[in-house]
């Protein structure tokens, strides 16, 4: 057993020895192979490593060089900037000194100027106050005269419009009656002319029937007029009684009636039509005068007379006043614009001849006092702000009805802002 045990131990030792030898062999071979591999890798990577090292070395050198150059440049730029700031501060100080000098000289000049101006203002203050007081008094007097004239004109125009309205209403009421009587008369004349024999035979019954109709019509008309008169008197008495007994209620009823009447659009249309109808005769009469005077001015060279010469004037003016109703507004405006120029040209042409005769000089002076448009009325309206006294009241009203951009002075063509009536 001991021999077997020894054999087994010997075999184990041998195996252990072989294992150790194999491990040593593997360790040596693996170390040798690793060394060879590292050597080959080192040899293979040596150029790249050298180049990379040189590249990093060059890059570091360049960066350090650039940093050095940048530091030098910044130092130089900072020095130059500091020098420029110092120079600019010196220049600013010089400019401030210069500005102070200019300011001192300007202050001295302005103080001297203010002193001179104050002395002049103190000298001229009294004269200016006196002139302003005179101007204020003149303006106040002009405004008072203008207000009084405006009130008088408003009263006259209102009275004229009222009478024109009454005449128009009277014409509107009596016109249909007259036309009806004309139609009845024409109808009766036609019947009488077509049946003369029958009228002769039936004259007595027809006469009786006509007398009966006439008496009935007179009776009916008298009854109607009597009753209407009674109703009107009764209404007047009732109105007076109501006004005396209940003035507040009457005033309230009148106010309500007027408000309801003003609320109706037909009332405004009727009022506008009445105003237009009342203005129409005035406008036609004024345009007739303008047109007749323009025709008279145009016919002066053909007649060979002076302004105001009586040769055939009334007939021509009368015949010319019948036609201007159909003239368009453009022709009327053209007449207004050209009439003063023609009048002035004719007056200038006749001036040498008139200078030799006192009668002609007197006529020329009277013509100069006439309106430059119609040459019929005297100049009574002063145009502002040009201060030309060249128009009458009627022509001024016609001119002021035009748009604002057409309201120009006939002499200087400046815009008319205001008119002032002048009493010579």
Curated annotation (Swiss-Prot):
It is a multi-pass membrane protein. It is an enzyme of class 2 (transferase). The keyword Zinc-finger applies. It catalyses: S-ubiquitinyl-[E2 ubiquitin-conjugating enzyme]-L-cysteine + [acceptor protein]-L-lysine = [E2 ubiquitin-conjugating enzyme]-L-cysteine + N(6)-ubiquitinyl-[acceptor protein]-L-lysine. Pathway: Protein modification; protein ubiquitination. PROSITE patterns: ZF_RING_2. Keywords: Endoplasmic reticulum, Membrane, Metal-binding, Transferase, Transmembrane, Transmembrane helix, Ubl conjugation pathway, Zinc, Zinc-finger. Disulfide bonds: none annotated. E3 ubiquitin-protein ligase that plays a key role in endosome organization by retaining vesicles in the perinuclear cloud. Acts as a platform for perinuclear positioning of the endosomal system by mediating ubiquitination of SQSTM1 through interaction with the ubiquitin conjugating enzyme UBE2J1. Ubiquitinated SQSTM1 attracts specific vesicle-associated adapters, forming a molecular bridge that restrains cognate vesicles in the perinuclear region and organizes the endosomal pathway for efficient cargo transport. This is E3 ubiquitin-protein ligase RNF26. The lineage of its organism: Eukaryota, Metazoa, Chordata, Craniata, Vertebrata.
């Amino acid at each position: 057993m001991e021999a077997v045990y020894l054999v087994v131990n010997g075999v184990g030792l041998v195996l252990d020895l072989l294992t150790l030898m194999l491990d040593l062999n593997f360790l040596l071979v693996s170390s040798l192979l690793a060394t060879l591999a590292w050597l080959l890798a080192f040899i293979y990577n040596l150029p790249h490593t050298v180049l990379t090292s040189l590249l990093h070395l060059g890059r570091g050198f360049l960066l350090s060089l650039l940093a050095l150059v940048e530091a030098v440049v910044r130092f130089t730029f900072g020095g130059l900037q500091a020098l420029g700031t110092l120079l600019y501060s010196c220049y600013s100080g010089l400019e401030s000194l210069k500005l102070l000098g200019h300011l001192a000289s300007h202050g001295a000049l302005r103080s001297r100027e203010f002193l001179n101006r104050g002395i002049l203002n103190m000298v001229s203050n009294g004269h200016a106050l006196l002139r302003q007081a005179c101007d204020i008094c003149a303006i106040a007097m002009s405004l008072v005269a203008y207000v009084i004239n405006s009130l008088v004109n408003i009263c006259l125009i209102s009275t004229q419009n009222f009478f024109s309205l009454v005449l128009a209403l009277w014409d509107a009421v009596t016109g249909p009656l007259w036309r009806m009587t004309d139609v009845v008369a024409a109808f009766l004349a036609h019947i009488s002319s077509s049946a003369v024999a029958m009228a002769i035979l039936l004259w007595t019954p027809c006469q009786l029937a006509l007398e009966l109709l006439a008496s009935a019509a007179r009776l009916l008309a008298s009854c109607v007029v009597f009753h209407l008169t009674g109703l009107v008197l009764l209404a007047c008495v009732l109105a007076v009684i109501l006004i005396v007994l209940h003035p507040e209620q009457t005033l309230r009823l009148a106010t309500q009636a007027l408000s309801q009447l003003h609320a109706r659009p037909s009332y405004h249309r009727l009022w506008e039509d009445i105003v237009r109808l009342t203005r129409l005769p005035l406008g036609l009469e004024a345009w007739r005068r303008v047109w007749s005077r323009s025709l008279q001015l145009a016919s002066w060279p053909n007649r060979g007379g002076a302004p105001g010469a009586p040769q055939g004037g009334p007939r021509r003016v009368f015949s010319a006043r019948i036609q201007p109703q159909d003239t368009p507004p453009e022709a009327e405006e053209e007449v207004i614009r050209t009439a003063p120029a023609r009048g002035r040209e004719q007056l200038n042409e006749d001036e040498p001849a008139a200078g030799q005769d006192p009668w002609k000089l007197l006529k020329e002076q009277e013509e100069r006092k006439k309106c430059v448009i119609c040459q019929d009325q005297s100049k009574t309206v002063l145009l502002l702000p040009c201060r030309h006294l060249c128009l009458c009241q009627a022509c001024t009203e016609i001119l002021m009805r035009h748009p604002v951009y057409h309201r120009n002075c006939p002499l200087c063509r400046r815009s008319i802002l205001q008119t002032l009536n002048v009493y010579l």
